[in-house]
UniProtKB/Swiss-Prot annotation:
Substrate binds at residues 15-17, 41, 136, 219, 251, 263. Zn(2+) 2 binds at residues 99, 136, 174. The modification N6-carboxylysine is found at residue 99. This is Dihydroorotase. Its cofactor is Zn(2+). GO terms for biological process: 'de novo' pyrimidine nucleobase biosynthetic process; 'de novo' UMP biosynthetic process. Homodimer. Catalyzes the reversible cyclization of carbamoyl aspartate to dihydroorotate.
Amino acid sequence: MQSITFTRPDDWHLHVRDGAALAAVVPHTAERFGRALIMPNLRPPVTTTAQALAYRDRIRAAVPAGLAFEPLMSLYLTDNTAPDEIERARASGAVIAAKLYPAGATTNSDAGVTAIDKIYPVLERMEACGLVLCVHGEVTGGEVDVFDRERVFMEKILSPLVRRFPALKVVFEHITTAEAAQFVRAAGANVAATVTAHHLLLNRNAIFAGGIRPHHYCLPVLKRETHRVALVEAVTSGNPRFFLGTDSAPHARSTKEAACGCAGCYTAHAGIELYAEVFDAAGALERLEAFASLNGPAFYGLAPNADKITLVRESWSVPAGFPYLDDDPLVPLRAGESVGWRLA
């Protein structure tokens, strides 16, 4: 197969930052995707519906003319989130999810939830009104090995949460392990997961190939090859509760190539093409459309996009960097290397 045409995909987990950084990265996503669920971990975080609507306006202003891209918004949950804010979010029609960040788990998560029981009233309201809970599934205690954070989170927090709120729609974001994939398969229809392209393409050896590779450092961290293989099997299986979420996370080069570098891989420049590589290598290109374009909208109760895109089997070279901040470029995944599929 030399080309594939399918329903325009959506990105169900995206970071676009704000200000000049936002203007630099939004076009990459808008060229490929019809919609994206925007993560709320700005500094300060997006904790109210009013803030989310203002942020949506700033994103819309950065969409190039002629592209019909729609940002879908989320709220950042804190220990102090009010249940009434959930009602406002749901009523807005623009905010479709709220994000649980365990405090300290990832970039700009220091304002996150310190104990899950502190947000039980909020989760009850979300369950009642149908707002989706998106979860960064890692514990943060120093006694837990960084490669075990996802597994321990499932055992201590996610499993009890799903039992306590059986009608709450939950997305286990950017899963990285065979155990997480199995958790989703075994759960009810109200539990789904996003999977990133980099966790499907890379294992943890990529962080240390010939030296420290800061542009392969993300959270949750890359895992063993056995887990990567299990994730590929999950996304190509046809199970409708796995769908595309790039977790594309832009950082200036100086903050990645540093003594204490930021976590995140930037993939929006090839946000659908990298997934095509994965499905092609697995002999499952015919299942890419469901994963990228159909499963996510179905879970969120939305219609698929009306238009289509075409990918061509044609190699292209990824630039060494993209303009980002003044004299501080953005280094994308595969910088200086090639991608095997191209957006027509």
